[in-house]
């Protein structure tokens, strides 16, 4: 197990849709261990595999003391609406208000191939949508209004140049 370095915008791995996990290999097991260890830090709600440089459909979460993971997640339902602050480990230092569905449900598998269903409202619902966005090659900045998005991307470019 290892705490992995977080990739930040504009790293291309964050913009590439992740591949489905076709087989549970030792490398996939190590990936899950690394995701769980890396997300296990105060203030971290979720972490997708591409945020640590691996383009596979997997994420870990740490919400209200519940830590876990899901492989090959599919966002199958969302409803309601919430509007609130959102941040991202791959966009350090920036928080913006974003609109998301309040409730979300994701279905995937665990390392033994068993079905996993994660669902929730509020922070859990936001995290499920946020991590599925990552796995599809999107970051939360894509959900911002045009001017806020431009401002955030400018900030990230300037941060990278330093």
From Swiss-Prot:
Question: Under which main EC class is this enzyme filed?
Answer: hydrolase
Q: Which domain of life is it from?
A: Bacteria
> One GO biological process from the UniProt record?
co-translational protein modification
Q: What is the phylogenetic placement of the source species in the record?
A: Bacteria, Bacillati, Actinomycetota, Actinomycetes, Bifidobacteriales
What does this chain do? Answer: Removes the formyl group from the N-terminal Met of newly synthesized proteins. Requires at least a dipeptide for an efficient rate of reaction. N-terminal L-methionine is a prerequisite for activity but the enzyme has broad specificity at other positions.
Q: State the active site.
A: 131
Instruction: For this UniProt record, give its keywords in alphabetical order, as a comma-separated list.
Output: Hydrolase, Iron, Metal-binding, Protein biosynthesis
Q: Which GO terms describe its molecular function?
A: metal ion binding; peptide deformylase activity
Cofactor(s) needed: Fe(2+)
**Which Pfam families does the record associate with it?**
Pep_deformylase
- State the similarity comment: Belongs to the polypeptide deformylase family.
Q: Which reaction does it catalyse?
A: N-terminal N-formyl-L-methionyl-[peptide] + H2O = N-terminal L-methionyl-[peptide] + formate
Entry note: cofactor: Binds 1 Fe(2+) ion.
Q: Where does Fe cation bind?
A: 88, 130, 134
The protein's name:
Peptide deformylase 2
Q: Which CDD domains match?
A: Pep_deformylase (cd00487)
This entry's Enzyme Commission designation comes to 3.5.1.88
Q: Which InterPro entries match?
A: Peptide_deformylase, Peptide_deformylase_sf
């Amino acid at each position: 197990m290892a705490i992995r370095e977080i990739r930040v915008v504009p790293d291309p791995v964050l913009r590439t849709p992740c591949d489905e996990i076709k087989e549970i290999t030792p490398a996939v097991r190590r990936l899950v261990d690394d995701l769980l260890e890396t997300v296990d830090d105060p203030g971290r709600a979720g972490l997708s595999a591409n945020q640590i440089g691996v383009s596979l459909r997997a994420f870990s979460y740490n919400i209200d003391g519940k830590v876990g993971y899901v492989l090959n997640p599919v966002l199958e339902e969302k409803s309601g609406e919430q509007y609130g602050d959102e941040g991202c480990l791959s966009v350090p230092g920036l928080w913006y208000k974003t609109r998301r569905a309040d409730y979300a449900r994701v279905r995937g598998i665990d390392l033994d191939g068993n079905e996993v269903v994660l669902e929730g409202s509020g922070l859990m619902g936001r995290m499920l949508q946020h991590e599925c966005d990552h796995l599809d090659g999107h970051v939360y900045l894509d959900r911002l209004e045009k001017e806020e998005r431009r401002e955030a991307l400018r900030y990230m470019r300037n941060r990278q140049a330093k």
